[in-house]
UniProtKB/Swiss-Prot annotation:
It is an enzyme of class 3 (hydrolase). This is ATP-dependent RNA helicase DBP2. The keyword Acyltransferase does not apply. One of its GO terms (molecular function) is mRNA binding. It holds the Pfam family DEAD. Residues 539-552 have a biased composition (Polar residues). Residues 1-12 have a biased composition (Low complexity). Residues 350-497 form the Helicase C-terminal domain. The keyword Cell cycle does not apply. It comes from the Eukaryota. Residues 1-66, 493-552 are annotated as: Disordered. It comes from Yarrowia lipolytica (strain CLIB 122 / E 150) (Yeast). Residues 13-55, 498-536 have a biased composition (Gly residues).
């Protein structure tokens, strides 16, 4: 049983029908019951003709391109926002001050005022109950402005850093949206589609949707590659209101006829910049072309490059936009950034030195980033042989093993995780105190996203970075980030960023120096070579390397 099975919702349905409080039927009379879709299904008889004018051939394999006829499409509701009296009474000056305090920049016409607490957001009682049961004290900045924007039914762009609460910004309005639509019939696809760049992020989004959809019995499934398709196909066949998917696997499901997007009226593109960075733009365009054009589209991103702007221009209409913080690349000020200029040969000694400090606190979690899968495996083996309980996660690991590694890290059973950039975004593990960039990434955007794994939700964190001569081209951009966050700067980095001088050295490898005491850190039951219950043949390569007793 893999860690991922804990929230796969294999029985999907939380019980029979949907109808909290008497079902989804009339909803205050505004929908007029389940009619509206015409006849028994309302999709024009044999479903194939939804949208009217047939299909056109394209270059998308077996996936036909829809030729939409808006006049024949059934109508649907998407504006559910009713401004709370407390929000209405706020003066323009008060609203401006609140937005300034929370570093909000707005673009577009008719943007609703922000809310300042959960009760003002206008969510139905069943949603508010779930929120309060989860222990949230107050909404984040992106939620304060994003919820009213999403609930109006407008197309929305939200630009905010990772860890800012974007998932709930679209998840809760999605639940309201679903409960205002006619229930699914046999053969229907989802009502809400969320596209995400990685399977890890997709699974985390599913967790949030599952938490807040229980009371209204909203079903969801997660569709991603790297695992057998069987369970995902069965979930889709049973019918789910929400599909969270990576573009490649969803496209495969669509082309093979395992699902359709004819019922989608609420589309979310999460971490749009990351999806484009990973080369998913063609797949995204193929998928979005399968969705009715009068849908509501919400695009969320940590950055706002031209490629993302172009995608928004092509697929969003009359959109409203909120940016939290500066659009200039910047790191969280909750993170202490320590950049050390060194040689490639010095990295391992520095890594051990920092781990000795980091792991003095037995509750610490440390995420180490490498530039390649090979280095991730090499470092993991080295650390385990040196007595550190490290595990690796990267694209060559099977999904079951990746899920297990994440769970071991999340629970603190293996408090050191070595990762490639597959984990640099979207993985939301609470309590990561330290990030170590063993290899500096190829660009400063990835640097910011990597170190953003710590210092989240108002907590403090520390990021150590090893910067070598090979990284010289990135020095200027890194200096901008460090100065903006008012961090101490290594004089050697200043020199590299100024472009002065040749490649001159800063000394050879030097001695290893003393490592300090070697014993002492033992967390109950971990030591030896055990894996807290043993995974047998599921664990491969570096993760199966024997663990010395010398350090933990």
């Amino acid at each position: 049983m893999s860690y991922g099975d804990d929230y796969n919702n294999n029985d999907r349905g939380y019980g029979g029908g949907r109808g909290f409080g008497g079902g989804r039927g009339g909803r205050g009379g505004s929908r007029g019951g389940r009619g509206g879709f015409g006849g028994d299904r309302g999709f024009g008889g044999d479903r194939g003709g939804y949208g009217g004018g047939g299909y056109q051939d394209n270059d998308f394999g077996n996936l036909p391109k829809q030729d939409w006829d808006l006049e024949k499409l059934p109508q649907f509701e998407k504006n559910f926002y009713k401004e709370d009296p407390a929000v209405t009474e706020r003066t323009d000056e008060e609203v401006t001050a609140f937005r300034k305090e929370n570093q909000m920049t707005l673009h577009g016409d008719g943007i609703p005022k922000p809310v300042t607490n959960f009760d003002e957001a206008g969510f139905p009682p069943y949603v508010l109950k779930e929120v309060k049961q989860q222990g949230f004290e107050k909404p984040t900045a992106i939620q304060c402005q994003g919820w009213p924007m999403a609930l109006t039914g407008r197309d929305v762009i939200g630009i905010a850093s990772t860890g800012s609460g974007k998932t709930l910004s679209y998840c809760l309005p999605a639940i309201v949206h679903i409960n205002a639509q006619p229930m699914l019939s046999h053969g229907d696809g989802p009502i809400v589609l969320v596209l995400a760049p990685t399977r890890e992020l997709a699974v985390q989004i599913q967790q949030e949707c599952s938490k807040f959809g229980k009371s209204s019995k909203i079903r969801n499934t997660c569709v991603y590659g790297g695992v057998p398709r069987g369970q995902q196909i069965r979930d889709l066949a049973r019918g789910v209101e929400i599909v969270i998917a990576t573009p490649g696997r969803l496209l495969d499901m669509l082309e093979s006829g395992k699902t359709n997007l004819r019922r989608v009226t609420y589309l979310v593109l999460d971490e749009a910049d990351r999806m484009l960075d990973m080369g998913f733009e063609p797949q995204i365009r193929k998928i979005v072309d399968q969705i009715r054009p009068d849908r509501q589209t919400l695009m969320w991103s940590a950055t706002w490059p031209k490629e993302v702007q172009r995608l928004a221009h092509d697929y969003l209409k009359d959109q409203i936009q909120v940016n939290i913080g500066s659009l200039e690349l910047s790191a969280s000020h909750n993170i202490t950034q320590v950049v050390e200029v060194c040689t490639e040969y010095e990295k391992r000694d520095r890594l051990v030195k920092h781990l000795e400090t980091v792991m003095e606190n037995k509750e610490s979690k440390c995420l180490i980033f490498t530039g390649t899968k090979r280095v991730a495996d090499d470092i993991t083996k080295f650390l385990r042989q040196d007595g550190w309980p490290a595990l690796a996660i990267h694209g060559d690991k099977q999904q079951q093993e990746r899920d297990w590694v994440l769970n071991e890290f999340r629970q603190g059973k293996s408090p050191i995780m070595v990762a490639t950039d597959v984990a640099s975004r979207g993985i939301d593990v609470k309590g990561i105190n330290f990030v170590i960039n063993y290899d500096y990434p190829s660009n400063s955007e990835d640097y910011v996203h990597r170190i953003g794994r710590t210092g989240r939700a108002g907590t403090k964190g520390t990021a150590y970075t090893y910067f070598t001569e090979d990284n010289r081209k990135q020095a200027r951009d890194l200096l901008v980030i460090l100065r903006e966050a008012k961090q101490h700067i290594d004089p050697k980095l200043e020199e590299m960023g100024g472009g002065r001088g040749g490649r001159g050295g800063w000394g050879g490898r030097g001695g290893r120096g003393g490592r300090g005491g070697r014993g002492g850190y033992r967390r109950g039951g971990y030591g030896g070579g055990g894996y807290g219950g043993g995974r047998g043949s599921d664990i491969t390569g570096s993760n199966s390397a024997p663990l010395s007793n010398s350090r933990w």
